[in-house]
Design a protein with these regions (language model features):
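C-terminal accessory subdomains/tails of enzymes that are appended
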Residues: 1-209
Length: 209
């Protein structure tokens, strides 16, 4: 959980450029986490440590990675695989992740140009279609199939959120979610985007899974 000092630090930084200024009583939710940084004996504070990752071979047949961040996960994976390939004496090929589109990426731009048609045919509003395209890309077709089978799942999950109920069903039927926490914290961004980490949505989510 974020401390008061964490919250005040963010407010101070944001208020350097925002007008009107943000106030602590306007915050609807906070979170904090630990970043796995690579130690550096020359640095006395974590704020000056590099966010880069490092790949190591601490023992024969064992490749490890430390540091890094969410946004560089594909580069991290590539570096680990490529190092493992060396260990395997090139019995397999190096990583090809940079050539592989993310799931749902193929056809995304064509569908984005057709969002009005998709909205008209599905009965959804255009903003919801844009939300679904940004979350699922070309896999939006699987969400639309769920709605076609159960039209009531096209309704919103909370008036102030972009999510629809079909996404909760999809999380369990297609993405392996097994609990309310799986859905709120992992398959969606409700724990970040909803007030109080989405706790007030728990009963509604539970009824859908």
């Amino acid at each position: 959980l974020a401390s008061k000092e964490d919250v005040q630090y963010i407010l101070d930084q944001a208020n350097r450029v925002l007008e009107p200024k943000l106030r602590a009583d306007e915050i609807i939710g906070v979170y904090a986490g630990l970043r796995p940084l690579v130690a550096n004996n020359k640095s006395a504070t974590t704020t000056k440590l590099s966010r880069e990752h490092t790949v190591d071979r601490p023992a024969a047949g064992f490749v490890s990675i430390a540091g890094g961040k969410y946004t560089t996960y594909r580069v991290m994976a590539k570096d680990v695989v490529d190092r493992a390939v060396i260990e395997l004496r090139r019995l397999t090929q190096e990583s090809v992740t940079e050539k592989l589109p993310l799931i749902g990426a193929d056809g995304y731009f064509a569908l984005e140009q057709q969002k009005e048609r998709i909205a008209q045919e599905s009965g959804l509003d255009v903003e919801t279609v844009k939300h679904l395209l940004n979350r699922y890309g070309a896999l939006i077709s699987e969400i639309l199939e769920i709605i076609e089978e159960q039209p009531k799942l096209a309704t919103k999950l909370g008036a102030d959120l972009p999510y629809i109920k079909a996404e909760i069903v999809y999380a369990t039927s297609h993405e392996g979610a097994r609990s309310v926490d799986d859905v709120i914290s992992r398959r969606t961004r409700l724990s970040f985007e909803a007030v109080n980490h989405g706790v007030h949505l728990a009963d509604e989510v539970a009824a859908l899974i």
